[in-house]
From Swiss-Prot:
InterPro entries per the UniProt record, alphabetical: OxalOxredalpha (IPR054917), PFOR_II (IPR033412), Pyruvate:ferred/Flavod_OxRd (IPR050722), Pyrv_Fd/Flavodoxin_OxRdtase_N (IPR002880), THDP-binding (IPR029061), Transketo_C/PFOR_II (IPR009014)
Keyword line: Oxidoreductase
GO MF, any single term: oxidoreductase activity, acting on the aldehyde or oxo group of donors, iron-sulfur protein as acceptor
An annotated GO BP: response to oxidative stress
One Pfam family from the record: PFOR_II
pH dependence: Optimum pH is 8.7.
General function of this protein: Catalyzes the anaerobic oxidation of oxalate using a broad range of electron acceptors, including ferredoxin and the nickel-dependent carbon monoxide dehydrogenase. Does not require coenzyme A as cosubstrate. Enables anaerobic growth on oxalate which is used as energy source by the bacteria.
UniProt subunit comment: Dimer of heterotrimer of one alpha, one beta and one delta subunit.
Chain coiled-coil ranges: none
Reaction it catalyzes: oxidized 2[4Fe-4S]-[ferredoxin] + oxalate = reduced 2[4Fe-4S]-[ferredoxin] + 2 CO2
EC identifiers of the protein: 1.2.7.10
Organism: Moorella thermoacetica (strain ATCC 39073 / JCM 9320)
This protein's name: Oxalate oxidoreductase subunit alpha
Enzyme class: oxidoreductase
Length: 395
């Protein structure tokens, strides 16, 4: 065990980056992620981290800087929130297409309008199909640990893909919690120095990202598809190795809570699921068979694991902390993903969506209680009268 400190999610991520011994960091301020860069700037200034700290003139520039640095063989880090995430959209696909294991922390924030700076998953979910590994931490400890795990997976020669290490703005980024900061020797055992054999080298000139003939594109896209498809195996290995070295065991895909004999569960990702667990625990004490399944890996989506582990429940409520206008079922991205994964099971598993927590609002105990009551009603009657509910307006 390392040193346990009471720190925020932002500071925890910064310690993860320090322990990863990154070479290049590029920053641009936007709350709530800014605290990560503030702490990293202090670490560099105080000599705790030997890294090149670059200030971008915007998020597009941030991603462009780490794109080039990674292509030159550096281990790199950047981050953003909200509209900053979408401003850099042009650069995400080139980074994954060039198979550069850039890591980007996203401390979620709602998009404009109305200019709300509260937490939502909408910003990060906009980027979900760019060929990056993506998942959410629900505590400061998990935010630090995911930083290390994602570098390990993304830099594996079987993968070579960038990663969005997501954490809920404010609910994780700013709230303090106990964090075991690992010893550097342990981290070096888990995360060896980055070695990419295909880097820019003036002694061996090459070109990156050129214009090509249309017929040359599909094979490259297929290679990227195969790389994303292969992430799960490497992620499983990394989580096993992490548990061996650090003593903290993470399921690669799902954090299940009180699900062994549950009849209904709430499925979602991020910090609000910790509140869902508290409500499930209370209802269990009253004799109700309820549980929670928190998704740890959003991309690549663990379809087979979802089928295997969640098809046994009578009803599943899906919490989407995002605004997805015009989407199928009037819910969110997670509801669509889950329904697609469980399509083969037809009406055996009833699903219903809950859109809540928009704009950084707290999803309260009472709201989760109402969700569980709706799920119990669906399990009993076998009828889904409405495919999705916006909380608190419709339930």
């Amino acid at each position: 065990m390392g040193k346990v400190r009471n720190i925020s999610g932002c500071v925890a991520v910064a310690h993860g980056v320090r322990l990863a011994d990154v070479d290049v960091i590029c920053s641009y301020p936007i709350r709530p992620y800014t605290g990560i860069m503030s702490e990293l700037a202090r670490m560099v200034a105080d000599g705790e981290l030997d890294a090149e700290f670059v200030h971008g003139e915007g998020e597009h520039a941030q991603l462009s800087v780490v794109y080039g640095a990674s292509a030159a063989g550096a281990r790199v880090f950047t981050g953003s929130s909200g509209v900053g995430v979408t401003y850099a959209m042009e650069v995400y696909s080139p980074i994954s297409g060039e198979r550069l294991p850039v890591q980007m922390a996203i401390a979620d924030r709602t998009l404009d309008p109305p200019g709300d700076f509260g937490e939502e998953h909408t910003d990060a979910e906009c980027c979900r199909d760019q060929g990056w590994i993506q998942g959410w931490a629900s505590t400061p400890q998990e935010a630090l640990d995911n930083t290390l795990i994602y570098y390990r997976v993304g830099e594996d020669q079987r993968v070579l893909l960038p990663q969005y290490a997501c954490l809920d703005g404010y609910f994780v980024s700013h709230i303090l919690g106990p964090v075991d900061i690992p010893d550097e020797a342990q981290v070096k055992e888990f995360l060896p120095p980055y070695k990419n054999h295909h880097v820019l080298d003036p002694r061996k000139p090459q070109i990156i990202g050129p214009q090509i003939e249309p017929a040359m594109g599909p094979p490259l896209q297929y290679q990227r598809y195969q790389a994303v498809k292969g992430v799960h195996k490497v992620l499983e290995e990394a989580c096993d190795e992490f548990a061996r070295i650090f003593g903290r065991k993470y399921d690669p895909y799902l954090d299940e809570y009180l699900t062994d004999d549950a009849e209904v569960i709430i499925f979602g990702q991020g910090a609000h699921m910790e509140t869902a667990k508290a409500v499930a625990r209370r209802l269990r004490n009253l004799g109700e068979k309820v549980g929670v399944a928190r998704l740890r890996t959003f991309r690549p989506f663990p379809t087979e694991q979802i089928k295997e582990r969640l098809s046994k429940f009578k009803a599943i409520g899906v919490l989407d902390v995002s605004a997805n206008f015009g989407i199928s079922c009037s819910g969110g991205v997670l509801l669509s993903e889950l329904r697609a994964a469980l399509y083969d099971y037809g009406d055996k598993v009833k699903t219903v969506g809950f859109v809540a927590g928009l704009g950084g609002e707290v999803v309260t105990h009472d709201e989760f209680y109402r969700m569980f009551q709706k799920l119990k009603e669906i399990a009993k009657t076998g009828k889904v009268e409405q495919t999705s509910y916006w909380i608190p307006f419709e339930l």
